[in-house]
A protein has these predicted regions:
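Bacterial N-terminal signal peptides
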Residues: 8-18
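Flexible, solvent-exposed loop/hinge segments and secondary-structure transition points
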Residues: 19-128, 133-138, 142-155
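Bacterial N-terminal signal peptides that target proteins for export
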Residues: 1-9
């Protein structure tokens, strides 16, 4: 066997087996805002990563953009809170891992609706674990809990 083959074959095998990370943007910030607050006619920036959703002069709630680490890479997500600090909606905007994307499923994200800063929010408790996306589901749950702790009393 030539030196060239002996040196490149192991690298080629590793490259063919390793799964690449896939960065997929599912929603823009603007699209997620409109999904969360369809009656809003403006979003006023609040602190650089959150916006007050308004219909005229009426405050509808707060839209918060955040990110957490999945297993190795960032997950960008958004949480919409009503004026009482309750979760109205959670959306995954961008998922970069090559597996574990089940955290995007609407049935899983719907578990957060109605939660407040006093909710337990525990994977394996009031939030289902996703087999194959254990760390992603854990970290998104922790992120939503952090958003509620920081913004849940924005009134």
């Amino acid at each position: 066997m030539t030196d060239w083959v002996r040196l490149t074959l192991p690298a080629a095998l590793v490259a063919s087996i390793a799964s690449p990370a896939l960065a997929v943007q599912y929603l823009s910030v603007e699209a997620a805002q409109k999904l969360a607050f369809p009656s809003a006619n403006r979003f006023v920036e609040y602190d650089g990563k959150s916006w007050k959703a308004q219909a005229g002069d009426k405050l509808l709630g707060l839209f918060v953009l955040d990110h957490v680490i999945g297993k190795h890479l960032y997950i960008d997500y958004a949480v919409a809170l009503d004026t009482n600090g309750r979760v109205m909606r959670v959306e995954i905007l961008q998922y970069r891992e090559s597996y574990g994307g089940e955290v995007r499923e609407s049935s899983w994200l719907a578990q957060f609706v109605g939660k407040t800063s006093s909710s337990v929010l525990k994977v394996g408790g009031d939030i289902r674990t996703i087999s194959g996306a254990t760390l992603s589901s854990l970290h998104v749950t922790e992120g939503v809990k952090r958003v509620l702790a920081n913004y849940g009393s924005h009134r």
